[in-house]
Amino acid sequence: MKNKLIIALTLITLIISSCSKEECEGCRASITGKVHAKNYNASFTQLLSEYYAPDEDVYIIYGDNNFYDDKITTDPNGVFEFKHLRKGNYTIFVYSKDTTFTIASCVEAKYLDAEIKDKEEVVELPDFEIIK
């Protein structure tokens, strides 16, 4: 009975550790950037305001995954930072209003790719431009 319990606990530990995301507590690499928003009228013909967007959701995809792995929110200055990342490729995205009126959901994803080559690297992305 004792051996079965030890084997079961070992298997559970192996399964849990093999399913871990690419976030790494010992790593200091990060991806940072800003989200810049433009607010237009309903027909998108007149720019009403623009600003760095606070409280905007920003998503990250680790490697070749098909769904986002983590989500954070921009700070009051529109800044975001994904921390504790391993070496590898990442896709960062945000959502913006569709200005072409061709997407049923009325929103489109804006993507930027990033590569971390060193465990202490800080990758600074260009600003995301979104329509509010």
Name each model-derived stretch.
Residues 49-71:
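Short amphipathic beta-strand segments in non-cytosolic proteins
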Residues 97-125:
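Structured interaction patches on ligand/partner-binding surfaces of diverse proteins
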Residues 15-18:
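C-terminal motif of bacterial Sec signal peptides marking the signal peptidase cleavage site
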Residues 88-94:
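A short tyrosine-centered beta-strand micro-motif
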Residues 2-9:
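Sec-dependent signal peptide recognition
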Residues 75-84:
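Short, surface-exposed beta-strand/beta-hairpin micro-motifs centered on an aromatic residue
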Residues 29-38:
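A short, amphipathic beta-strand motif
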